[in-house]
């Protein structure tokens, strides 16, 4: 299933949730490194996205990005937001509330182009569980909610 950022997706099944938790656990247990690797892959594959991160401007190499405290800080925030979504899979109202709040911040305060949520979600899905339809469904749920304030 490709990741979508509009419309709706079917609820996650119990089997999908179990598989997501199993795939996510080793990534989150090493969240500092995993988060930086994901964010660096995102920026090196989509350099235009860096314009929304003034502190990252001018960092053109993966090595520069990996050494940046600002990149590490933001990577941790992204990983924690995904972890919150994984932890809230059984309480979609809680997940929705948190991600809608995050959407508002990104739309109003940071003025991030929402197309990049889907791109980042694809990098995360590829890193965590490449080709897994359940994880892609979770990433779709996240993307749809992150676009809610736009």
From Swiss-Prot:
Gene3D superfamilies: Globins
PROSITE patterns attached to this UniProt entry: GLOBIN
Record organism: Lampetra fluviatilis (European river lamprey)
UniProt key word Transport: yes
Family matches, as InterPro entries: Globin (IPR000971), Globin-like_sf (IPR009050), Globin/Proto (IPR012292), Globin_lamprey/hagfish (IPR013314)
Protein name: Globin
Keywords: Heme, Iron, Metal-binding, Oxygen transport, Transport
Annotated ranges, domain Globin: 11-150
Residues that hold heme b according to the record: 74, 106
Similarity-based family: Belongs to the globin family.
Pfam family, one: Globin
Record GO terms (molecular function): heme binding; iron ion binding; oxidoreductase activity; oxygen binding; oxygen carrier activity
Assembly: Monomer.
